[in-house]
């Protein structure tokens, strides 16, 4: 009698993300790690979502589809490796919002950081994103100067 899975309303979803296509191996490692985690707890994973893009980008298609499914109450559990694999900033807000939708987020590597350590990680993330944008602008400027039609 007592198998709780029979009463499960929504799906169990593994969500993985890397910042760029060059990290696809890391994406696969996340998937395998999270599947092992779920299996060890007797959880049946209904869907695996693999996303490529910045955690600061809230226009990620896979991520938005996941949020939409949560709002439609089709998801009961999201399993992630780290908070920053879900969103880079504002995790607590999303966690509270999704909890109201009946969704539990399970963080496998939930290391506790001091406020100072979190601030340093946030600053490093911001610097990384903006340095990438500067590089992209330089590349664009160079391309513009080389294009004779412009």
Segments from the language model and where they lie:
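Short, structured surface patches at the beginning of a domain
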Residues: 1-150
């Amino acid at each position: 009698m007592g198998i709780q899975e029979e009463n499960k309303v929504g799906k169990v979803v593994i969500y993985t993300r890397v910042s760029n296509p060059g990290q696809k191996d890391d994406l696969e490692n996340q998937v395998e790690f999270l599947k092992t985690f779920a299996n060890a707890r007797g959880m049946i994973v209904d869907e695996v979502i693999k996303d490529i893009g910045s955690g600061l980008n809230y226009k990620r298609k896979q991520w938005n589809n996941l949020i939409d499914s949560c709002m439609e109450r089709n998801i009961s559990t999201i399993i992630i490796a780290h908070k920053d694999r879900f969103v880079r900033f504002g995790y607590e807000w999303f966690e509270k919002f999704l909890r109201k939708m009946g969704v539990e987020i399970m963080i496998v590597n939930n290391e506790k950081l001091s406020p100072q350590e979190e601030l340093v990680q946030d600053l490093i993330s911001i610097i990384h994103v903006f340095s990438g944008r500067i590089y992209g602008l330089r590349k664009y400027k160079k391309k513009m100067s080389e294009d004779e039609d412009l």
